[in-house]
Amino acid sequence: YWQNYPKFMVSFMKAMWGDAATAENDWAYHYLPKLDVPAYDVLRIFEMMDQGRCNIYFCQGFNGLLAFPDRGKVTRALSKLKLLVTIDPLETETSRFWENHGDHNDVDTAAIQTEVIQLPSSCFAEDEGALVNSGRWLQWHWPGAEPPGEAKLDTWIMAQVFLRVRDLYLKEGGVFPDPIVNLTWDYADANEPTPEELAKEMNGR
């Protein structure tokens, strides 16, 4: 099975960058970021934050302030960011880490310069698509209700981030805009790819 890995890789690169990925440029392999360490997992990212080596963090459906054992270190790390964006159906401790609540969150709010943007997202029951779990179940589900208020689907939120970043690169250029401006984004509605489109693409459409 894995003897077909080169074919899988080419299929992936063509799905990502379409006509910009050719045999002549090694299927745009140079577009992919290369690891200089074994992995950039969430533990390493927070360590880099604490060292002042990470300026922006998108926190999607994750409450780091409660997930990690060293709350003080996580707060210190978040305080060193220039920008924190949280995407979550609920207001989390991470999204409000800068607020002083006495013994529950004793921080110096005035000393924290991190800009925090909270983007309300839908919860799983308001979304459509695939669910997997540790029991290896793969289930497709449909929304039970519309997201309340200003909450949006994660796909809509991430699409808006991508489209705006791409527009900035197209207008202003940059050090290496090619992976962003050449990214394939040929969905029926560019503002909100459907779960069906995404599932087909991941399966090698």
Where is each model-derived feature located?
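Non-catalytic alpha/beta scaffold blocks inside enzyme catalytic domains
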Residues: 1-204
